[in-house]
Amino acid sequence: MRKIFLYLILSIVATATANAQESQTEYNFLRLPVSAHAAALGGDNVSIIEDDPSLTFSNPALLSSVSDKTLNLNFMTYMEGAITGSAAVNRVVNDKASWAVLGQYINYGKMKETDQNNVQTGEFSAQEIALAGTFSYMLAKNLAGGITARWVASYIGGYNSMAAGIDLGLNYYDPESEFSVSAVAKNLGGQFKAYDEDYGKMPLDLQIGASKRFANMPFRISATLVDLNHWDYSFINHLVCGVELILSDQFYVAGGYNFRRAHDMKIAEGTGEDASKSSHGAGLSFGAGMQLERFKLQVGYAKYHVSANSLLVNVSYSL
């Protein structure tokens, strides 16, 4: 089992490098954060170790840290008129293996349908859905591996497309030093039913991240490098960083910054030589979480640009 996981990870790295310059336009809702904890830390985090099923969406290897029979429900408002929801439930097989079932859904709302003369003839809706199964396994004392197999469908009016893909993840965690490092390949796959004859790929994303909690201090810091299969923009814009203030085992507050989100959302202010660009807070994120026995509530807020933000709520309950 250990050799299989390591071989798969190495194969993914090679494939990601070979496809580094390919466009990523299909099923990009899979890039959205599902975990409010990860959202608060900048939107991408693959390395924090918590008893939290929603982190499985970020890294399938993190399922090994989740308690048996935990139900997780998530809801997020995203941009204008778009809402997304997700759910997860897991089982612990033994001291090494766990599995989970995951689901994601996004509704983009109603849109106008017009003819070639721009005359409105009605309305149509658009939505996307993903269903997945995850398996994680302890490959060694401190090393976990995980795989998620996912089916994805997109519906626009009376048309639809379908795809299949996998996520692969590794996590090394040393509980004595509270240091965690992970590598993840997300969304390797492609369409088997396209809207037209142009079959596309899923939004492949190679990520590496690390988290560290300091001894005798209530802080944990995280840094994640994302989209490492594309190098046509500056290195700093691959970085997502975050910090947590862990007030107790039951409560934390967190903040993060996503450099690429801030860069992409900059808008010009002024004209001529006096013109400047400002992100108006885009890239910033905040959140908090609390746990009461078997119940956990987490909230994450992120700024996308001057007129758009998201609010993500997670609820988990151990049965």
Locate predicted features.
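Sec-dependent N-terminal signal peptides
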Residues: 4-14
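Subset of outer-membrane beta-barrel
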Residues: 21-319
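Sec/Tat signal peptide C-region and signal peptidase I cleavage site
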Residues: 15-20
